[in-house]
Amino acid sequence: MLRALSRLLSTTTASVHLPIVPEKVVDHAYTTKNYKWMPGFSFPAPRSLEQVVKLALLEREPPARIREIWNEHHAPRLDSVATVWGGEEVAALAERRRRCPRFVYPVLKGDGKFFNLIAEWQDKFCIFSYLDDYRKDPSRAEPYLSVALYDDLLARTGLVLVRGDFSGHLTKRDAAHVLNLMRHFYFVEPKWVETFNKEPAAFDFSAFVAAVPRPPEKTDAAAGKVLF
């Protein structure tokens, strides 16, 4: 693993920080007023779904309406992205993340420039940190993005609500694309995740970057629905 990280750090990258100025967030009847903007944070994602929504109200709704409410709540927010996954997807992810808890994600900034995030799963949360900082000291690396899986409604609806909270180092479009890259490489094209964790010496970073799906010009970043 360390050899794979060392090779990544020797790759030419460019880091572009684009802070975002928060706008007023529209209230929703089923959501809490727990709005916060964090240019830097120790743990960005709410630990429980009840910190985000009024769960007692939301759980009464049918699955289709739950999707709508979840996406409507996050659409105007400039500190988080969200999507909804099915239970089968999350079950497959649970097994793979246990065997392959870490992976690297290039954040593409155009003109061939990018910087790398290293992601590490901790139970139902995935923390994304700047790779250079992580390599120096993982315990002190600042999180740029944290993805949380909320499975409170899984048994009744078959849905898992997914939310990614990000710092001012990322734009909303960046965060939405990284969230979808995570889904792509853990569900659709897992060979890169498997190689990175199990055979790090064989991980070809240049080939990997060439294989990374590029974000479309127009992204439904509010709901985190970039489809490859």
Residue ranges of each PLM-predicted region?
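Context-gated lysine
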Residues: K24, K33-K36, K54, K109, ...
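The feature represents the first ordered module of a protein
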Residues: D79-D152, L161
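Charge-rich, low-complexity N-terminal segments
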Residues: L2-G110
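Alpha-helical oligomerization segments
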Residues: T171-F228
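Charged, surface-exposed interaction regions in soluble eukaryotic proteins
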Residues: I127-H184, V193-K198
